[in-house]
């Protein structure tokens, strides 16, 4: 087995730390060389069979199982069922066994922003003032925290997720699976515009027709006007590695001067965005608040709607008829209400207060109507993402089992055909699995305590558990 070797020294831990044990990671001098390697490359002759025994197994979709077992063979779930029914061939070839109180699929957050700047919500201006290297460092830390907290997948809907995903996938950093839109597409004077800056400054940095020599077109926002510009904008995001396309189809809260009730982009522009994405086997996710934008996004063929603050029965029936996913993002609203708008410009704070009640009624209405829902927070990697499960239950009206389904089994729908088989504990699915020390069906807030997440497997590899170091290495024998 080839490994990048690091020594991990526990540091002083604050009782209030959201991270659990904090480590100082430094390279081992014996392992230093000039060739960058993946963190872990397993040899082909390893057995790679893991058996996990669980007092309670929550499959993601379906009823929980008592006294269950799950077998991971390589990266795939090979068996799920009663521990008495484990095929003997796995018992003979077991590499490792674990016994845990609760086992379930890894969590998803389906509405992240990989901005990595220190003041994202202040009218987006800090995004242009923050060096991408600083953004990358913050995002690396946040992605590590996310995995430790039980989040094995993120959908990024405006940010550097495409670039961070490459670093995670090649083993440079540790984090969840990341499915990114790249930049969110906005019209001029739309939700992705930066009204506090001169138009030339914004268009020079984020305008789709203005990529400079050596410029990757890799920012969190992309301004495009007219059918040819939006077509190019979609193609640029796919070139960058986008797995889903994000469009601002109405005004928003954080954009200082637009109106959340007004639709953005013309029907022709939206149609081209959806068609161009579909040509590359991608779905389109639409930011929408007001009904005009909601209906335009539905008509254009968007398959995932975010926020949907001013919806009614007509909207819910259309979403069910067309198989459209709803991601409510209640957390960001609750967080700002609780802080009295701390960090927001006054215009954004006024808009958030104006739509908060309507958004909650819409969320509750969607749940009662049976709309398919996935959970997302509209926050940054490593943030308080587990709050969304609590709000789904306590504010939205879901049962804990329904909230878990929305955070696991439903979540891959948010990236359409680009999603692998994951989000459920089923045979043939990727082994993105977490273990808990307490039952979330009895207390949904258990996800907010990182220590309650005792084990995390991503793609069959154990990244958190007894004897596992901060980089997913075997801390008991790091030289293997």
Curated annotation (Swiss-Prot):
Coiled-coil annotated residue ranges, if any: none
Domain-related comment: Each subunit of the homooctameric enzyme folds into a two-domain structure characteristic of a metal dependent amidohydrolase, with a twisted TIM (triosephosphateisomerase)-barrel and a smaller beta-sandwich domain.
Active site (record annotation): 246, 378
Any single biological process term in GO: ochratoxin A catabolic process
Gene behind this protein: Am2
Name recorded for this polypeptide: Ochratoxinase
Compartments where located: Secreted
Source domain of life: Eukaryota
Similarity comment text for this entry: Belongs to the metallo-dependent hydrolases superfamily. Ochratoxinase amidase 2 family.
Effect listed in the UniProt record for changing residue 206 to S/G: Affect substrate binding and carboxypeptidase activity
EC number: 3.4.17.-
Keyword Secreted: yes
Uses described in the biotechnology field: Detoxification of contaminated food is a challenging health issue and ochratoxinase is a promising enzyme that hydrolyzes ochrtoxin A, a mycotoxin demonstrated to have nephrotoxic, immunotoxic, genotoxic, neurotoxic, and teratogenic properties; and that occurs in a wide range of agricultural products.
Residues binding Zn(2+) 1, per UniProt: 111, 113, 246
Activity-pH behavior: Optimum pH is 6.
UniProt catalytic activity: ochratoxin A + H2O = ochratoxin alpha + L-phenylalanine
Alphabetical list of Pfam families matching this protein: Amidohydro_1 (PF01979)
UniProtKB keywords: Carboxypeptidase, Hydrolase, Metal-binding, Metalloprotease, Protease, Secreted, Zinc
GO cellular-component term (any): extracellular region
């Amino acid at each position: 087995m080839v490994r990048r070797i690091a020594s991990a020294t526990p540091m002083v831990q604050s009782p209030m730390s959201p991270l659990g044990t904090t480590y100082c990671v430094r390279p081992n001098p014996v392992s230093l060389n000039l060739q960058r390697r993946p963190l872990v490359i397993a040899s082909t002759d390893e057995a790679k069979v893991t058996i996990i025994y669980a007092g309670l197994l929550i499959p993601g979709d379906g009823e929980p199982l008592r006294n269950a077992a799950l077998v991971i063979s390589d990266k795939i779930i090979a068996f799920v069922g009663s521990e008495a029914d484990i095929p003997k061939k796995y018992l003979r070839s077991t590499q490792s066994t674990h016994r845990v109180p609760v086992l379930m699929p890894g969590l998803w957050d389906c509405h992240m922003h990989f901005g990595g700047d220190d003041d994202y919500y202040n009218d987006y201006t800090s995004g242009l003032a923050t060096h991408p290297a600083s953004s990358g460092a913050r995002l690396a830390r946040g992605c590590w925290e996310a995995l430790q907290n039980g989040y094995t997948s993120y959908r990024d809907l405006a940010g550097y997720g495409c670039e961070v995903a490459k670093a995670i996938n090649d083993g440079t950093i540790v984090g969840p699976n990341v499915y990114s839109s790249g930049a969110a597409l906005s019209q001029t004077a739309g939700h992705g515009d930066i009204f506090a800056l001169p138009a030339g400054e914004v268009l020079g940095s984020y305008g789709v027709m203005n990529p400079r020599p050596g410029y990757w077109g890799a920012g969190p926002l992309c301004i495009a006007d007219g059918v040819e510009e939006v077509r190019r904008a979609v193609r640029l995001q796919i070139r960058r590695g986008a797995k889903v396309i994000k469009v601002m189809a109405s005004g928003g809260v954080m954009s200082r001067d637009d109106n959340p009730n007004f639709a953005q982009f013309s029907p022709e522009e939206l149609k081209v965005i959806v068609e161009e994405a579909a040509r590359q086997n991608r779905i389109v996710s639409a930011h929408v608040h007001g009904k005009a934008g909601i209906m335009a996004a539905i008509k254009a063929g968007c398959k995932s709607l975010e926020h949907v603050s001013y919806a009614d029965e007509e909207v819910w029936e259309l979403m069910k008829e067309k198989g459209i996913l709803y991601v409510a993002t209640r957390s960001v609203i609750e967080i700002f209400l609780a802080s009295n708008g701390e960090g927001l410009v006054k215009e954004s704070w006024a808009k958030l207060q104006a739509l908060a009640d309507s958004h909650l009624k819409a969320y509750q209405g969607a749940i009662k109507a049976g709309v398919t829902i996935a959970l997302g927070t509209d926050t940054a990697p490593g943030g308080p993402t587990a709050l969304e499960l609590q709000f789904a239950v306590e504010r939205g009206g879901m049962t804990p089992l329904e909230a878990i389904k929305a955070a696991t089994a439903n979540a891959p729908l948010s990236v359409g055909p680009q999603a692998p088989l994951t989000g459920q504990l089923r045979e043939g699915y990727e082994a993105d699995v977490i273990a808990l020390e307490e039952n979330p069906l009895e207390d949904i807030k258990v996800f907010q305590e990182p220590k309650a997440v005792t084990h995390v497997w991503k793609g069959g590899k154990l990244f958190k558990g007894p004897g596992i170091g901060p980089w997913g290495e075997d801390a008991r024998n790091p030289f293997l």
